[in-house]
Regions:
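Hydrophobic alpha-helical scaffolding
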Residues: 6, 67, 138, 142, ...
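Metallocofactor- and cofactor-centric catalytic cores in central/energy metabolism, strongly enriched
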Residues: 1-132, 146, 156-158, 167, ...
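Internal helical hairpin/lid segments
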Residues: 229-320
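Phosphate/pyrophosphate-binding betaalpha-module
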Residues: 138, 142-205
C-alpha cells in the first residue's frame, strides 16, 4: 500500500470529514460504539472527537480483553499463585488487574512466583527450566490471541509436557455485541468493528447485526483515516437504510477471515458460556479446552475452591463503561481514587482500557477536569 504524504493525509481527512458532515443530519444524535481498545486509543490520539460533528457520539465498548476478564477469574489466578508448587505465566498487563482482595503484583511482592511473558510459547521454556513446578498460563484474549494460544496448547501436547496448564478465559466478540443489543439499556446506532479480531473471523460472524437487528457496522483499521472512513460508511448505511457489514480494512481483513486459524481454534476449543466483567454470563461467548486437551486445563487437572466470594471493587463502574452506558469520566472514582498509578478497576489497568485512555488523553485544556 502506498504511504501517503502529510499533505495527502490532510486532503483525505478533509474529504472524509466533508462527506461525514454531508451525511449527518443537523441536530441528530448518532451513537457509534467502537469495539476495540486500540480504536479507543487511536480516536483520542488522533483527536477525532473534536473533528466530528457534535451530534456524532463515539462510545467505547467491551473491546479490551484485560478489562472484560471476570473478577472470579482473577481470584482463581490469585489462588493458584498462592501455591508454592505453581509458577504463574502471564502477560504484563494482567499484573495490576484487581481481584476481590488482591492483585498479581501484590501477590508477587509477597513471594508468589509470577513470570511475565511476551509470547505464549515461552511457557514451553519455563516448563523445562522449572520441571519441579507447575506452570499455569493465564490464557485470556479475543480471537486474535486465541489463535496464538492454540498453537501453544498443541506444542505443549506434542512435546508431552506434564507440568504446563492453562487457566482459560477467552472471549468471543460477536456474542458480546448481541448481548449488548439484547439488553437494550444503551442505544447504539452502529458499530465500528475491530480490525485485528476480524482478521481471524472475517465478516460473516457479524452478519446478524444487519440481518436481525438492522444496525449498520463497519470493520476499521487503526489510523485516523481508516476510522473516519468506517464512520462515513456507517452513516451512508443509515442514510440509505441498506444495512450491511461494511469493511474499510480490505487490505487486511478477508470476507471469510483466516480459515487456518479458525480450524485450529475449533480443533483445540469448544464454545461455552462465559462471564464478562460487569456484564454477566453471555451465552456462547467463551471457550473451553476440548476433552482431548483436558489434562492441560488447570481447573480440571488441579481444581480449587475459592473460600471467599468474588466481589467487584466498591463504587467501580467498569461494567457500565464496558457497555457504553456511561463515559469513564462519569464514574465517581475516575481521577480520584482510581488513577493510572492506583487503578481500582480493570478498565484503568490496560493501556487499551477505556478509562486508561480517557485518563491519558481526555484531560481538558484547563488541566483540572476530564472532557465528558
Amino acid at each position: 500500500m502506498k504511504k501517503l504524504t502529510l499533505q495527502e493525509k490532510q486532503n483525505s481527512a478533509d474529504a472524509l470529514l466533508k462527506r461525514i458532515n454531508a451525511l449527518h443530519k443537523p441536530g441528530e444524535t448518532v451513537r457509534l460504539m467502537e469495539v476495540c481498545g486500540t480504536h479507543t486509543v487511536s480516536i483520542f490520539r488522533e483527536g477525532l472527537r473534536q473533528l466530528l460533528p457534535s451530534g456524532i457520539e463515539l462510545v467505547s465498548g467491551p473491546g479490551c480483553p484485560v478489562c472484560v476478564t471476570d473478577q472470579t477469574y482473577m481470584d482463581k489466578a490469585l489462588a493458584y499463585a498462592e501455591r508454592d508448587d505453581v509458577i504463574i505465566a502471564t502477560f504484563g498487563d494482567m499484573l495490576k488487574v484487581p481481584g476481590s482482595y488482591s492483585s498479581l503484583s501484590e501477590a508477587q511482592t509477597k513471594g508468589a512466583h509470577i513470570h511475565v511473558i511476551y509470547t505464549p510459547l515461552e511457557v514451553v521454556e519455563l516448563s523445562k527450566k522449572y520441571p519441579e513446578k507447575k506452570i499455569v498460563f493465564l490464557a485470556i484474549g479475543f480471537e486474535t490471541t486465541i489463535a496464538v494460544i492454540c498453537a501453544t496448547v498443541k506444542a505443549v501436547h506434542a512435546a508431552g509436557l506434564k507440568n504446563v496448564f492453562f487457566l482459560v478465559s477467552h472471549k468471543l466478540v460477536p456474542p458480546a455485541l448481541r448481548a449488548l443489543l439484547d439488553k437494550q439499556e444503551g442505544h447504539i446506532d452502529g458499530f465500528i468493528l475491530p480490525g485485528h479480531v476480524s482478521v481471524i473471523i472475517g465478516e460473516e460472524p457479524y452478519q446478524f447485526l444487519p440481518e436481525e437487528y438492522h444496525i449498520p457496522s463497519c470493520i476499521a483499521g487503526f489510523d485516523g483515516l481508516e476510522i473516519l472512513s468506517a464512520i462515513a460508511n456507517i452513516l451512508e448505511q443509515r442514510k440509505t437504510s441498506n444495512f450491511i457489514v461494511g469493511n474499510t480494512y480490505h487490505s487486511v481483513v478477508m470476507q471469510k477471515g483466516n480459515p487456518v486459524a479458525q480450524a485450529m481454534i475449533k480443533e483445540v476449543y469448544d464454545v461455552c458460556d462465559d462471564a464478562w466483567r460487569g456484564i454477566g454470563v453471555i451465552p456462547n461467548s467463551g471457550l473451553r479446552l476440548k476433552d482431548e486437551y483436558a489434562a492441560y486445563d488447570v481447573e480440571r487437572a488441579l481444581p480449587i475452591h475459592l473460600e471467599r466470594p468474588s466481589l467487584d471493587p466498591k463504587g467501580c463502574q467498569c461494567g457500565r463503561v464496558l457497555q457504553g452506558l456511561i463515559k469513564p469520566s462519569e464514574c465517581p472514582l475516575f481521577g480520584k481514587s482510581c488513577t493510572a498509578d492506583h487503578p481500582v478497576g480493570a478498565c484503568m489497568v490496560s493501556v487499551e482500557g477505556s478509562c486508561a485512555a480517557w485518563y491519558k488523553y481526555g484531560y481538558s485544556s484547563g488541566g483540572s477536569t476530564w472532557e465528558a
